[in-house]
Amino acid sequence: MGLYRVRVSTGSSFCAGSNNQVHLWLVGEHGEAALGWRLRPARGKEVEFQVDVSEYLGRLLFVKLRKRHLLSDDAWFCNWISVQGPGASGNEFRFPCYRWVEGDGILSLPEGTGRTVVDDPQGLFKKHREEELAERRKLYRWGNWKDGLILNIAGATINDLPVDERFLEDKRIDFEASLTKGLADLAIKDSLNILTCWKSLDDFNRIFWCGQSKLAERVRDSWKEDALFGYQFLNGTNPMLLRRSVRLPARLEFPPGMGELQAELEKELQQGTLFEADFSLLDGIKANVILCTQQYVAAPLVMLKLQPDGKLLPMAIQLQLPHKGSPPPPLFLPTDPPMTWLLAKCWVRSSDFQLHELHSHLLRGHLVAEVIAVATMRCLPSIHPMFKLLIPHLRYTMEINIRARTGLVSDSGVFDQVVSTGGGGHVELLQRAGAFLTYSSFCPPDDLADRGLLGVKSSFYAQDALRLWEILSRYVEGIVSLHYKTDESVRDDIELQAWCRDITEIGLLGAQDRGFPVTLQSKDQLCHFVTMCIFTCTGQHSSTHLGQLDWYSWVPNAPCTMRLPPPTTKDVTLEKVMATLPNFHQASLQMSITWQLGRRQPIMVALGQHEEEYFSGPEPKAVLKKFREELAALEKDIEIRNAQLDWPYEYLRPSLVENSVAI
């Protein structure tokens, strides 16, 4: 009993306010009090009022709210509700919401302290947890876009998504406006150049968007250089393929007269400076047919050497795997005629485009993040500390992935229109790539060690990924230590165990065979797993997303398709190169989509900078503050390093890393 001060915060996005009336109740350990009709929430506003409660409530557990309407349901986006009392000396309790309130049902918001099942011995929150998860499992159902692929949220369109997973209006308007602009520019360029005959590589300037990326302009000017070709395996938009050679690849057969090359490769191998990029995953993938014209896919192997100055230079390129009973395929060398060597590198870059966009970016970034998001919503109630830790890193992931499945990789989507693996090959590639989703490959300390990239001073991706992983790991450990005092408390958390199992066994289709845990047996194992989840949704995605505009804007550096088969001889002319690279329309659409998806997003939340406060109490806030301080220190270190580099690496710079897979 006594006077309570109540504050209610409404979101700032368009349509966040409501004309409907909201009714509130306070629920404590010893009683419940109705506060009456008190407010019509206004967008971006915080409403405060005081109310005298006659009942003795004890410690507050919930705020219940109900929105009532007479004519139409006007959804309300509630940020949080704060209650202080009884009296001026009473405690303040924060009740996080950060969701849409629709209909006229009663919504219960638990106080913001993170609590596991073990933390609730009296069962004060037991019913709420069970009812919330039961409702969530109806809303968040597993779906299967294509047989053989990891699972996704059920639903074919954005309207099938739970409302809380959809873009807020400001994000939706920006995304759709950029798409409209890109398609309009594409239509204009198509109409102006429909009869244009492409004769030289400089003709690609006609569809190149100057002023969008300084780095892209440098790529256009330097893309033919071997040093830049090798650099992209270390620090480009797909740093996930390169590995240090421990033996010469079995597929590397030497045609007659290649003894000197073999000796050079053996020498680099013995010195530990031989690296390889193997695209065997593309072997046998069905190539697209675009407007009745056959396209082509290759499965190259690139052998590279790391020089003392840190440059990674190509030594040989094999464009296709050898076949039993046939002569070894040709090996293309830097000493070949310039056009021959350039075309071989273009084939590698086109193959890298396919593996990057489908395997490294879509599958390992977007789709795995979606598995984490769906499992989190199905298994962890909003009061659970791991839900509170993870939820800022899952924002918008389900909608952006549905947009990808209905626009990019759908039937008649962008891949079918202009990409050589479209028309079904892209689905086959995703199915194959699932076998390579190993747990260790999602954890940079393990992945970089496995690929032999630790200690490579010119691999700025490796350096920044390790730093970011360590910072995330300390952040996760800080939160975990507040809520799990022993390994036994981890093992006894049935919600946590169900979440882990849902990710590994259900969403990832039995990934325990690939090293993913089915149960979490210790605090250390929990920290490692949660760090992996957050890194996947932040740094891992950003490292394969942010570079698209820089490296794919100049189409010859990353051709979306190839219109002639890979060369089998070395008599290559400029005419053959131009006939192989994408035509005008294909190149224009690649440029348009690259701009839309690769541009710096005007509406984004940088890593760790989310405004939502899901935790109550000073301890979690102190952990988050420390996390932000460490991110700021990393930001400064990267800034200082990049100032000394000819080609700055920024794709893991914390201010550019998005807090979730949202684009």
Swiss-Prot record:
Any single GO BP term: bone mineralization
Membrane topology: Peripheral membrane protein
Tissue expr: Detected in tracheal epithelium.
Domain PLAT, residue spans: 2-115
Localization, UniProt: Cytoplasm, Cytosol; Cell membrane; Lipid droplet
SMART domains given in the database record: LH2 (SM00308)
EC number: 1.13.11.31, 1.13.11.33, 1.13.11.-, 1.13.11.12
Binding site for Fe cation: 361, 366, 541, 545, 663
Record domain Lipoxygenase: where: 116-663
One GO cellular component term noted in the UniProt record for this chain: lipid droplet
Superkingdom as given in the UniProt entry: Eukaryota
Keyword vocabulary terms for this entry: Calcium, Cell membrane, Cytoplasm, Dioxygenase, Fatty acid metabolism, Iron, Lipid droplet, Lipid metabolism, Lipid-binding, Membrane, Metal-binding, Oxidoreductase
Cofactors (names): Fe cation
GO molecular function: arachidonate 12(S)-lipoxygenase activity; arachidonate 15-lipoxygenase activity; iron ion binding; linoleate 13S-lipoxygenase activity; phosphatidylinositol-4,5-bisphosphate binding
UniProt function note: Non-heme iron-containing dioxygenase that catalyzes the stereo-specific peroxidation of free and esterified polyunsaturated fatty acids generating a spectrum of bioactive lipid mediators. It inserts peroxyl groups at C12 or C15 of arachidonate ((5Z,8Z,11Z,14Z)-eicosatetraenoate) producing both 12-hydroperoxyeicosatetraenoate/12-HPETE and 15-hydroperoxyeicosatetraenoate/15-HPETE. It may then act on 12-HPETE to produce hepoxilins, which may show pro-inflammatory properties. Can also peroxidize linoleate ((9Z,12Z)-octadecadienoate) to 13-hydroperoxyoctadecadienoate.
UniProt family annotation: Belongs to the lipoxygenase family.
Protein name: Polyunsaturated fatty acid lipoxygenase ALOX15
Gene: ALOX15
